[in-house]
Curated annotation (Swiss-Prot):
Pfam families xrefs: Ribosomal_S14 (PF00253)
Protein name: Small ribosomal subunit protein uS14
Gene Ontology MF terms: rRNA binding; structural constituent of ribosome
HAMAP family with a match to the protein in the record: Ribosomal_uS14_1
Record's subunit section: Part of the 30S ribosomal subunit. Contacts proteins S3 and S10.
UniProt organism field: Stenotrophomonas maltophilia (strain K279a)
Residue spans crossing the bilayer: none
Gene Ontology BP term (one): translation
Gene that this polypeptide is encoded by: rpsN
């Protein structure tokens, strides 16, 4: 089980990313625009850098829904490898079974 402080930190990052998503997208559009002047691009890049660091979506971590484990998470199921294996062995995941050849 992951520390609750780490899980809560990720939840906080998700909220910040949603809050600043539109503002961040608008500034990125200006920075990558061909029509914007050099000064406008520098100004937009400075404003983008002043946004909270945790508002960037790339700082979010995929975590297991059950255990909160940060690594070995299958995004298709939202579960870590250990919990996915346990669920598969119980037959809770339809269409998924242990390989045998």
């Amino acid at each position: 089980m992951a520390k609750t402080s780490m899980v809560n930190r990720d939840i906080k990052r998700e909220k910040l990313a949603k809050k600043y998503a539109e503002k961040r997208a608008a500034l990125k559009k200006i920075v990558s625009s061909v029509d914007a002047t050099y000064e406008e691009k520098i100004d937009a890049a400075t404003k983008l850098a002043k946004l909270p660091r945790d508002s960037s979506p790339s700082r979010q971590r995929n975590r297991c829904e059950l255990s909160g484990r940060p690594r070995g998470v299958y995004s298709k199921f939202g579960l870590g490898r250990n919990k996915l294996r346990e669920a598969t062995m119980r037959g809770d995941v339809p269409g998924l079974r242990k390989a045998s050849w």
